[in-house]
Structures are given as structure tokens and as C-alpha cells.
Design a protein with these regions (language model features):
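Long, compositionally biased intrinsically disordered regions
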Residues: 462-542, 550-553
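Conserved small/polar residues in nucleotide/adenosyl-binding loops
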Residues: 555-559
Length: 559
């Protein structure tokens, strides 16, 4: 059966029944039909003095283009914990329409471990991302209107970009204000994908609506002729922008196919943004259940590093345990096996690729001081010989492992992982950040590059050098850094999978995000507006005469 058929056959519970499992009274719910609801932020005020549950982070090795199943493992783990009578909840990101219609597909899991209603979550859901797009573009409209109406603030340079939640490379650089009207000042502009926008980052890091408004007001949108900053609050924009987000800021409650509760809220990418769901949803999840399972996008070099160095500075606790997801196909890919041959058995390529997994484990254990288990996401094409080889190699290294068959068996296929996670959460961790906030900007970049990526150093463009000097001079040196880098490699070269030769990280630009509270470091050939592949997933998605969606809304299943 296709994933979409499995999802349609599931017996979902009314969302009020799902909420009841968590002890949420109906008056705290704002229902969007039978199976979705927003949770009033007043609930957190009621629960804030309650002890936090265990926090489990799910991350992975560097992925192949179709992903390795972090969401699948996360959902399977939550269902597995429920099967052994543990109170569990998921705290995941919302899917972006970019990947849904691009190459990767949706982000609601697969097989018998999905969050539902799958089609609605993968498309417009409760409208959060559209609200974020509107807030972002309202600010753009206010900037250009201010300039048109006389430019009282003296804009000389505008750095704020518009956004849209689609992969559209044609919008990376555009010319605007070409109407020829009096006072219209033509200028170069560009679009980011919404999930890489500063509004999305702010949305996911804000503690509450007041913090959201404060952060929005802090956004630097441009500079005057004297090089002085112009902020969103100078345009009196923060109030109207926050109004657009007043409902979006409330976490969304849904369920898995096995009726385990799930909070899905916020969705920044991890390669070009910080890659974690909202702080609000994560904090609420830890109050509502004994085990809160969350994930960070792409590999542990990106999402997990940003979760630990950026998001955890805004959370009351750090992870009690980490699951590092690995697949045999990805390990063979990192061993140099051509992607078209990836389903063929090969111990040779598997052996070469294991170093990628071992580097991620070393980072999580020795750089961050966390308790780690490897979740091997079993694919139909994995052979017994490959599985045994991988398990033996990891056991030789003293690595905790669990073979997970949740895609095919649901929560039942993740019981071993669930039991091991319960034990792992009881072991003390010795968490430490990769860098300290009082390190210089360059020290932060270089610590991540050398400790996490394994680079021998960092090279900076002249433009990046100047921006870093200016940021330090203007008092921004104590901010965390968010490195935008390819997800496919430890290096900034997507084709350098093996990373066996010494390499350097190349910083080409630096962007200050005062509202989000971090500095974005652009490396290699990374773009904040992705493009579509030659054959987009959109070509396979359709709707039949009865109104049923057909085609692939999910990533390719483990086959």
C-alpha cells in the first residue's frame, strides 16, 4: 500500500480525545475540524510550574537527497513509547511547500508511522506558514511605501527581502519599483523561501507573543546614509505584523496513525536556517508528557548543532538523549556508491561510508557531551549481511544501536528503540556547548568548522571579513552563529561526500538577524531560495474527479 492509502485507512480519534490523553481541557482548544486544533498559550501558564518531561532529540547522518527518515523514526519512537505504556508526545516542524512540490516530498513520516491528517499537514495545515509569509511581506510593503512617501527615515540601503513558501530560483534576484511613478525608486530586491526568513526564525525562538512582538521590532531592515540601522519598530511595523501572527503562534495539536499526540509548529530549514520547531511547542510538550520527542533538520552537523548551540539557549533544559538516524543506503552513498546503484548490496561501500556516522556520533558524545543511540532505519533493500556488518562494526566501537522497523510495523517496530531510550534518559549527561557566546564571531565559526565539520580552517571573502569587523565593532559579537551550508557533506561542497582530504570552509557572506538573535554565515554555494529539480514532485501530484489527492506527498518510502 502507498503511504497515502495507509493514512486514509487509519482510524483517527477526534482531536478532543487526543487532547484528553494529555490532560488538556476542551476550553484550551481551538479546533480546525475533527483532527486538528490549536492550543491556547494560556495552557502553558497553567502548567509552567510542572516538572519537565525527558527531552529526546532525533538527528541523523548527512542525508541523501531523499532524506533518511528522521521524522519516521521520531514518530515510530513516540508510538513505541506509547506501546510500552509511557506518556509520549512529538514536537515536530511544519512541512514547507517547497520540498513538498520539489524533490523531497512531504514531512509527515511514512508507511505505518505518520502524523495525520497527512494531506492537510503537508499542504496549508492551519495556515501558520502563510501567516508568516504575510507578516514578512507586510514589512516589505511598509518599507517601500515609506520610501515612496518621502523617505523620512533616510533609507539608503534596504536589506529586508520578500519571501514565498515555494522553491523558485527565478526570484533570487529581482528589480522592483519599475512602474515609472513619481517617487518610485527602482532597486534590486530578492526573495527567500519563507522557512528561511527571519520571521520564521523569530516565530520559532519567541517565548510568547510579547517576545514575538519585541523581536519583530528589533529587526534591522536597512541603513541610512550614515550607516545607521533602521529597524522594523522605526516603521511602526511590529504591531501589525504581530497581529498577523496572533493565531499562528499557538501550537498545533494532531496525532500519529496510532493516536499518539503530536505538536507540529514552525518549520525553518536546517541548511539555510536554524532547523528546529518552535520553542513554545517544545516547552509545552515537555510539560504535557513524560517523554517529548523532537527533531532537528538534516544531519547532526547542521540541525543538531543549531538545536544545541542556538535553540537550547532558549530552552529550560538540554536533551536527555539523542537518536542519530542512519540508513545503510546513505552510508553506501557516503562511501562513494553511485546513487543509481544504492539498492545493490555492497559491504565495500558500506565500510567506506561508516566514517560519516562515526564522526556524527563523536560530535554528539565528545563535543556536546550527550548520550547517543544510533537508530538504523531499516529499508526493504537492506540485506541481512549489510545489517549484521553494520551492527558488528558499531558494537566494536561501543556504540548503542537499535534496528528500527517502524515504517513497516508501526510503533511495534520501534519498541526496542523505545526501551533503550528510556534507559538512556536515566544516565547523566555532561552537556557543553560547542562555543561560548563571549567567543568572537570568527572563533565561533572556526570552532564549529573544526570541531563539528572536521575542517582544517576557514577562509573568508573580503566582504565577509568587513561585515564581521563591523558587527564586532557595533556590539553584536556575543550572538550565536547560524551557519548556512550544504546538508550533503561535512564540507561546504555538496559533491565532497567522503571528506577524506583536508578541506576548508569558505565564508562568502554574513547576515545579521537582530530579531532572531543570531548571525547567519553563508558558505559555499548555498542559497536562501532553493530551486526546483528537473522533475519536480509537483508533476506527480494531482486530484481526481472525486476530490481525492493522488500522487506523492511523502518522501520515497524505504524500498
Amino acid at each position: 500500500m502507498e503511504d497515502i492509502d495507509i493514512a486514509r485507512q487509519a482510524k483517527l480519534q477526534n482531536i478532543t480525545n487526543v487532547a484528553e490523553k494529555l490532560g488538556i481541557e476542551e476550553n484550551y482548544l481551538e479546533q480546525y475540524g475533527k483532527y486538528k486544533a490549536k492550543i491556547s498559550n494560556e495552557l502553558y501558564e497553567k502548567l509552567k510550574d510542572k516538572k519537565d518531561g525527558k527531552l529526546i532529540l532525533v538527528t541523523s547522518i548527512n542525508p541523501t537527497p531523499l532524506g533518511e527518515g528522521k521524522t519516521t523514526i521520531s514518530i515510530g519512537l513516540a508510538d513505541g513509547l506509547s506501546k510500552i505504556n509511557k506518556k509520549a508526545i512529538l514536537a515536530l516542524r511544519e512541512p514547507s511547500l517547497g520540498p513538498v512540490f520539489g524533490i523531497k516530498g512531504g514531512a509527515t513520516g511514512g508507511g505505518y508511522v505518520q502524523v495525520a491528517p497527512m494531506e492537510e499537514i503537508n499542504l496549508h495545515f492551519t495556515g501558520d506558514i502563510h501567516a508568516i509569509t504575510s507578516a514578512n511581506n507586510l514589512l516589505s510593503a511598509l518599507i517601500d511605501n515609506h520610501i515612496f512617501q518621502g523617505n523620512e527615515l533616510g533609507f539608503d540601503k534596504v536589506i529586508w527581502k520578500r519571501c514565498v513558501d515555494l522553491n523558485d530560483r527565478a526570484l533570487r534576484k529581482v528589480e522592483i519599483c519599475l512602474s515609472g511613478e513619481k517617487n518610485a525608486v527602482p532597486r534590486e530586491d530578492g526573495f527567500d523561501i519563507t522557512v528561511a526568513s527571519e520571521i520564521m526564525a523569530i516565530f520559532c525562538l519567541a517565548e510568547d507573543i510579547n517576545d514575538l512582538k519585541r523581536r519583530i521590532g528589533n529587526i534591522v531592515v536597512g541603513y541610512n546614509k550614515n550607516g545607521e540601522e533602521i529597524r522594523a519598530r522605526d516603521l511602526k511595523a511590529e504591531g501589525a505584523m504581530t497581529v498577523l501572527l496572533k493565531d499562528a503562534i499557538k501550537p498545533n495539536l494532531v496525532q500519529t496513525l496510532e493516536n499518539t499526540p503530536a505538536l507540529i509548529h514552525g518549520g525553518p530549514f536546517a541548511n539555510i536556517a536554524h532547523g528546529c520547531n518552535s520553542v513554545i511547542a517544545t516547552k509545552m510538550g515537555m510539560k504535557l508528557a513524560d517523554y517529548c520527542i523532537t527533531e532537528a533538520g538534516f544531519g547532526a552537523d547542521l540541525g543538531a548543532e543549531k538545536f544545541l548551540d542556538i535553540k537550547c539557549r532558549n530552552l529550560p533544559k538540554t536533551p536527555d538523549a539523542v537518536v542519530c538516524v542512519a540508513t545503510i543506503k546513505a552510508l553506501k552513498y557516503h562511501g562513494g556508491m553511485p546513487i543509481e546503484d544504492i539498492k545493490e548490496e555492497s559491504i565495500e561501500y558500506l565500510e567506506k561510508g561508516i566514517h560519516n556516522l562515526l564522526k556524527h556520533i563523536d560530535n554528539l558524545k565528545n563535543v556536546f557531551g550527550l548520550n547517543v543511540i544510533v537508530g538504523i532505519n531499516k529499508y526493504i533493500t537492506d540485506t541481512d549481511k549489510e545489517i549484521e556488518y553494520l551492527k558488528n562494526k558499531l558494537e566494536e566501537k561501543g556504540v548503542n544501536i537499535s534496528l528500527v522497523e517502524a515504517w513497516a510495523k508501526g510503533g511495534e517496530g520501534a519498541i526496542d528503540l523505545a526501551e533503550k531510550i528510556v534507559d538512556l534518559c536515566e544516565k547523566p549527561a555532561n552537556f557543553k556547548y560547542c562555543y561560548e557566546l563571549n567567543d568572537t564571531i570568527k572563533e565561533k565559526i572556526e570552532k564549529i568548522a573544526t570541531k563539528i565539520y572536521g575542517a582544517e580552517g576557514v577562509e573568508y571573502s573580503d566582504e565577509a571579513e568587513k561585515i564581521i569587523q563591523d558587527l564586532e565593532k557595533n556590539g553584536y559579537g556575543n550572538m550565536p552563529v547560524c551557519i548556512a551550508k550544504t546538508q550533503y557533506s561535512f564540507s561546504d561542497d555538496a559533491k565532497n561526500l567522503l571528506c577524506l582530504e583536508p578541506f576548508k570552509i569558505h565564508v562568502k557572506n554574513v547576515i545579521l538577524k537582530t530579531g532572531a538573535g543570531f548571525i547567519v554565515i553563508l558558505t559555499g554555494n548555498i542559497f536562501t531560495m532553493p530551486g526546483l529539480p528537473k522533475v519536480p514532485a509537483a508533476e506527480k501530484i494531482d486530484i481526481d474527479e472525486n476530490g481525492n489527492i493522488v500522487g506523492c506527498l511523502l518522501y520515497t518510502s524505504p524500498s
